[in-house]
């Protein structure tokens, strides 16, 4: 210790005194992946994971998405919550599929990549499902297909609309043909809804690709997308390597798809609840949500 350090009061740092590290709680601040702004975690969560600086739509967990859709302080019932994935094929690549399942369940806190619930939206009954991209990239396996089909069946029994928020890399390769079968299974479930005259609204979020985009994600009576979402079967890099041409700017983004008639609307996540309420009320010939709220 130097003679100066001995003379200085204990609360004052000298050149040789190490600075004390301040502990910042994990998750308190997040960085926008688009503009790089530092964002206060609780405020970002309240804004539904949309950057207040540049309006970039960041990833949002499935439960948070569904909670933002259904009426607050009302009961919701989770559909087929007890279902969990099984490694039927004993699949192994760099890891065993069973190990991947356990790791994803631990990291995400979910049994699989799709959550389905029954509740109310502005007082009207609704069934909704949402993908959680944190679980194996939102890939579609047997549990995802079964939960989707059961959710459609509940909507059929209740006689209410069905909404699905897609965020997926496509079919889950570790389940092989069992995964591909879900494309037909989910499409057939939507066929039964259509026969009953019940609306299905598909909300495509970033990213929606592969077998999910080639099945129920594009089968909505109305297809809505979030801004700048990547939507397509194969990724742009794969397509460029195949056709050996440079793709147009913004190719496979929601704005490009809207301009070319592949989707019906683009809606900001913060306005999604009101938009879906208006559309479902109109399609079910129910009172306008604002009129119902006023009453």
Curated annotation (Swiss-Prot):
One Gene Ontology cellular component: acetate CoA-transferase complex
Cofactor, how bound (note): Binds 1 zinc ion per subunit.
Pathway(s): Lipid metabolism; malonyl-CoA biosynthesis; malonyl-CoA from acetyl-CoA: step 1/1
Localization (cell): Cytoplasm
Keywords: ATP-binding, Cytoplasm, Fatty acid biosynthesis, Fatty acid metabolism, Lipid biosynthesis, Lipid metabolism, Metal-binding, Nucleotide-binding, Transferase, Zinc, Zinc-finger
Cofactors required: Zn(2+)
Keyword Transferase: yes
Any one biological process term the GO annotation gives: fatty acid biosynthetic process
Reactions the enzyme catalyzes: N(6)-carboxybiotinyl-L-lysyl-[protein] + acetyl-CoA = N(6)-biotinyl-L-lysyl-[protein] + malonyl-CoA
Subcellular location, principal: cytoplasm
Zinc finger (C4-type): 32-54
Binding site for Zn(2+): 32, 35, 51, 54
InterPro entries assigned to the protein according to its UniProt record, in alphabetical order: AcCoA_carboxyl_beta, Acetyl_CoA_COase_Trfase_b_su, ClpP/crotonase-like_dom_sf, COA_CT_N, Znf-ACC
HAMAP family assigned to the protein according to its UniProt record, in alphabetical order: AcetylCoA_CT_beta
Reported function: Component of the acetyl coenzyme A carboxylase (ACC) complex. Biotin carboxylase (BC) catalyzes the carboxylation of biotin on its carrier protein (BCCP) and then the CO(2) group is transferred by the transcarboxylase to acetyl-CoA to form malonyl-CoA.
Family per similarity comment: Belongs to the AccD/PCCB family.
Name listed for the protein in its UniProt record: Acetyl-coenzyme A carboxylase carboxyl transferase subunit beta
Organism: Xanthomonas oryzae pv. oryzae (strain KACC10331 / KXO85)
Taxonomic placement: Bacteria, Pseudomonadati, Pseudomonadota, Gammaproteobacteria, Lysobacterales
């Amino acid at each position: 210790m130097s003679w100066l350090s001995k003379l200085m009061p204990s609360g004052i740092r000298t050149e040789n005194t190490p600075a004390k590290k301040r502990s910042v709680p994990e998750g308190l601040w997040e960085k926008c992946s688009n503009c790089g702004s530092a964002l206060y975690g609780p405020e970002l969560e309240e804004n539904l994971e949309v950057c207040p600086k540049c309006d970039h739509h960041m990833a949002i967990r499935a439960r948070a998405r569904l909670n933002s859709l259904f009426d607050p302080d009302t009961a919701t019932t989770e559909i087929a919550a007890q279902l969990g994935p099984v490694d039927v094929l004993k699949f192994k690549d760099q890891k065993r599929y069973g190990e991947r399942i356990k790791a994803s369940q631990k990291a995400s806190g979910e049994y699989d990549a799709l959550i389905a619930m029954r509740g109310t939206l502005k007082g009207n009954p609704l069934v909704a499902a949402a993908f959680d991209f944190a679980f194996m990239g939102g890939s579609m396996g047997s549990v995802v297909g079964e939960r989707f089909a059961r959710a459609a069946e509940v909507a059929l029994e209740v006689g209410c609309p069905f909404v699905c928020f897609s965020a997926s890399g496509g079919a889950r390769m570790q389940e092989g043909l069992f995964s591909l079968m879900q494309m037909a299974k989910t499409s057939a479930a939507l066929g039964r809804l259509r026969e009953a005259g019940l609306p299905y609204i598909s909300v495509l979020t970033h990213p929606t690709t592969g077998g999910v985009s080639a099945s129920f994600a594009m089968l909505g009576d109305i297809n809505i997308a979030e801004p700048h979402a990547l939507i397509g079967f194969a990724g742009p890099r794969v397509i460029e390597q195949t056709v050996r041409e440079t793709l147009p700017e913004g190719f496979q983004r929601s704005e490009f798809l809207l301009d070319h008639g592949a989707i019906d609307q683009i809606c900001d996540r913060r306005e999604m609840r009101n938009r879906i309420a208006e559309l479902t009320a109109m399609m079910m010939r129910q009172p306008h949500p604002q009129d119902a709220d006023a009453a």
